[in-house]
Swiss-Prot record:
Domain of life according to the entry: Bacteria
Pfam family for this entry, one: Ppx-GppA_III
UniProt family annotation: Belongs to the GppA/Ppx family. GppA subfamily.
Protein name as catalogued: Guanosine-5'-triphosphate,3'-diphosphate pyrophosphatase
This enzyme's EC code(s): 3.6.1.40
Gene3D superfamilies: 3.30.420.40, Exopolyphosphatase. Domain 2, Hypothetical protein af1432
Pathway(s) it belongs to: Purine metabolism; ppGpp biosynthesis; ppGpp from GTP: step 2/2
One GO biological process term: guanosine pentaphosphate catabolic process
One Gene Ontology MF term: guanosine-5'-triphosphate,3'-diphosphate diphosphatase activity
Amino acid sequence: MERNPISPLYAAIDLGSNSFHMWIVREVAGSVQTLAKIKRKVRLAAGLNSQNELSEEAMQRGWDCLSLFAERLQDIPAERVRIIGTAALRTAVNADIFLSKAKDILGSKVDVIPGEEEARIIYQGVAHTSGGSDKRLVVDIGGASTEVIIGEGFDASALTSLKIGCVTWLERYFKDRYLTAENFDAAIDAAKNAIEPIVEQYTQLGWETCVGASGTVQALQEIMLAQGMDEIITLSKLKRMQRQAMQYERLEDLDIEGLTLERALVFPSGLSILIAVFESLNIESMTLAGGALREGMVYEMMSKMRHHDVRERTLTSVQERFQLDTSHASAVTNTAMALLSRCDEEWQLEPQAQYLLHASVCLHEIGTSIEFKKSGEHAAYLINHIDLPGFTRAQKHLIAELLRRFREQLTSLPEQHALSAQNAARILRLLRLAVILCHRRDHNQQPPFSLSVAENKLVLTLPAAWLLANPLSHVELQQEATRQTDMGWPLVLEESE
C-alpha cells in the first residue's frame, strides 16, 4: 500500500562487481531526498574463475545481500524500481543461474546492461549532481570495469567501458597481497595497455574539467582532507599515495591516515588504475563527482527533475524545503552582487567565489527555520548535513562557515579548501554588508550606495539623509565597520550629501 501518493518512493539497486547498493528516495521540493542507503561488500567479481564462472560462494553472498534488500522493496511498485547488473554479471558465463534466483528474491528482473549503457547512465548521474556546464571527462572505476566518458551538459559524446576494475586488478596483480613496486608497476602497465585504444579519440575530443565517480576517488579525497590537503586530485598526489602505501609490506598492514578499513582492500588496485588513467590521458586534475550510476538510474526514473543548472535547482529546492523568503534572498543577492561589482577590478575574484557568495546569500536565512538567536550556528549545521547536489564537499564547508558568520559577531574563517583564505574572507565581508543594507526587507527602502576599494580597505558611502532616517541601520553599519576593521579588514563608513 502506497502511503504517500503525492511523493512516491523510488528504488535504485546497483549489483556492482565489488559492492551491492540500494538507494531509496523520494522527490521533495524539486530535489531528491534519501530515505535509505544500504551497501554490502559482496565482491562478486572475486568469485570469477579463469573460465569466467561465478563460484557458488560468490553467488550466495549476492543472494544473501538481495534477501536483505527485498524487505525494503515490498511497498514500492515495480515500475518505480530499477535493478542493474554490471561488469561481473556481464562477464559471468553462468550469470543466468544467479539472475534467476535474484528475480525470485527481489520480485523484479535484474537488467544486466552493456558497458556503454552503464557509462551513459553514469554520465547522467554526474550531470544531474555535479556543478558547472563545462565539457567534462568522467572516470568511474568499478570492481570489474572502468567507464570513461566525455560529455557536455546532459549529453555524452564518447562512452567507453574498459575491462579493468579494482577487484579484478586486486586478484590479478596484488594476489599475493604484497605492496611492492613490482606489483604496482605491473598493475599500472596493464591498465595503460587497456586504456591505450581510446587515448587518441579522447585526446582529440578534449575536455575542460575532469571528475571521478568511484569509491577509489572518494577514498583518495578522504585521505587528502585527513592529511590537510585540498580536494583536488593530481598525479603528484596519486604518486604520493602510492609511496605511502608502499611503506607497508602487505595489504593487511595498510594504515594510511584517512583510509577506512572498508576501502583498504581494493585501494592499491584502484589507485593503480587511476594513475594509469591520469598518465595515459594526461589529466591535470580531478574532483569528486556528486553522483554516478545509482543517481543516473533515479534521475532517469524522475525525468521531470532535469534542470539545465544543477546548482540553481539545488538552491531553489532548499529555499522551498525550508520555506525561505525568496523575494528577500533575491534582494540581498542583488545587493551583494552590486557590492562585488565595485570590487571586481581591484580584487579580481574567480567566478567560483562569485557563485559561492550567491549561494550563501540565497541560503543565509536557513538557520532561522530553527531559531533566530543562534541562526548562524543552525545554518552551518544544516548546510553541513543536507545534500547539496552540484556543490563539492569543500564548497559546502565554506558556505556553512560563511553562514555561521553572516551577522553580528565576526571571527576568522577556519581552514578551508574551496577558495584562497583571502578571497573567502572577502566574500564574507560582502555577505555581511549586503545583509545589513537589506535588513528592512522593503526593497524600496534600500539606499543608493557607492563602494570603493584599495587592496583590503573598503569605503562605503551612503546618503546622509538616509542614515539620519534609518538610525538602526546606521548603528549596525558603524558596528560592522568596527568589527571588520578589528579583524584587519579596514571598513570606513562615509556620508554623502
